[in-house]
Regions:
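C-terminal boundary/linker segments immediately following FHA domains
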Residues: 91-140, 271-273, 277-278
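N-terminal cleavable signal peptides for secretion/export
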Residues: 25-70
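Bacterial N-terminal signal peptides
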Residues: 7-19
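Surface-exposed beta-loop interaction hotspot
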Residues: 115-171
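Extended, aromatic/histidine-rich regions of cofactor-dependent oxidoreductases associated
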Residues: 211, 231-233, 237-286
Length: 286
């Protein structure tokens, strides 16, 4: 496999030679807009991780509302959530309706939504208040943007993993990419993660030398973007935290086996604290 090539190395070296020290660069307009939109979403969306109250496996059923419930909700009468044959229903004094995965509905001053795999559906509950801290980023580094091919997976198939939001999904092994970083070439596993009913993204969940010292200890996600001609872009400036970095309501993905970069990847989202205690560094998923 031809290793990934940094698309900005030549211009970066030229800048050093002609202009002296290189100053921190502002992110490209598209990235700046995406970060601003994400900040707005965290601050205002009803299903923002900063508004999370609980996320639990529905199992044989969940009781919501009263203080002794599985999920106590102030001011909410007793409701029950159940799953049967992959379908989730909400039953209460004035409501009897299905919960469609990925579509939050109001319950008093709260929002609830269902997600996850059939037979293992989970219920997420969001409240009116925001807790925790928003997103913070390293200065933009054009030297951590790479492009190149993706090799086929060593073992094609599917594997169950926790996605960005801590919900179990069935991901497809998409392949591997090789990145020259920190003086060595690192091979990273890529998986296709479902993001909606008919949507998916190529994702890499990785650890690096900043974990626990600038970034979330468990690792970060970054999306691999298809380009023309069978190539892909990997931009570590777009690395982002799993939702468990924002709230302890979310379970935390275990690091993917082999996806560890010894060097410090000082790009993308930082960690400001306040999330779930991360899985031990030695604990890896398949």
């Amino acid at each position: 496999m031809i290793p990934y090539r940094c698309v900005c190395v030549l211009s970066l070296i030229t800048g050093i030679a002609l202009a002296g020290p290189v100053l921190a660069q502002s992110p490209p307009p598209e990235l700046a807009r995406d970060r601003a939109a994400y900040a707005d979403w965290l601050a205002a969306a009803p299903n923002s991780p900063l508004a999370a109250v609980a996320q639990q496996l529905i199992g044989p059923g969940l009781r919501l509302g009263p203080a002794d419930s599985d999920v106590p909700l102030k001011g909410v009468a007793e409701h029950r959530v159940s799953e049967r044959d992959g379908l989730v229903r909400l039953e209460g004094p004035d409501v009897s309706r299905p919960l469609v995965p990925g579509r939050p509905i109001e319950l008093g001053k709260y929002f609830i939504s269902a997600g996850g795999l059939p037979g293992r559906r989970v219920l997420a509950v969001y409240g009116p208040e925001r807790a925790g801290k928003g997103a913070s980023y390293y200065p933009y580094d054009p030297g951590l943007v790479f492009s190149g091919p993706m090799s086929p997976p060593d073992r094609p198939g599917r594997v169950r993993v926790l996605a960005l939001d801590g919900i179990e999904v069935e991901a497809a092994e998409a392949g591997t990419v090789s990145v020259p970083i920190g003086g060595r070439t690192v091979r990273l596993t890529v998986r296709r993660i479902p993001t909606g009913e008919d949507e998916s993204e190529l994702e890499i969940y990785f650890r690096d030398g900043t974990n626990g010292d600038g970034t979330y200890p468990a690792g970060r996600f970054v999306t691999l973007v298809p380009l023309p001609g069978g190539r892909y872009r990997l931009d570590f400036n777009r690395a982002r935290n799993p939702f468990c970095a924002y709230s302890s309501a979310f379970p935390c993905p275990a690091p993917w086996r082999g996806n560890t970069i010894d060097a410090r990847v000082e790009a993308g989202e930082r960690y400001l604290g306040g999330g779930l205690s991360a899985p031990p560094a030695g604990l890896e998923a398949k």
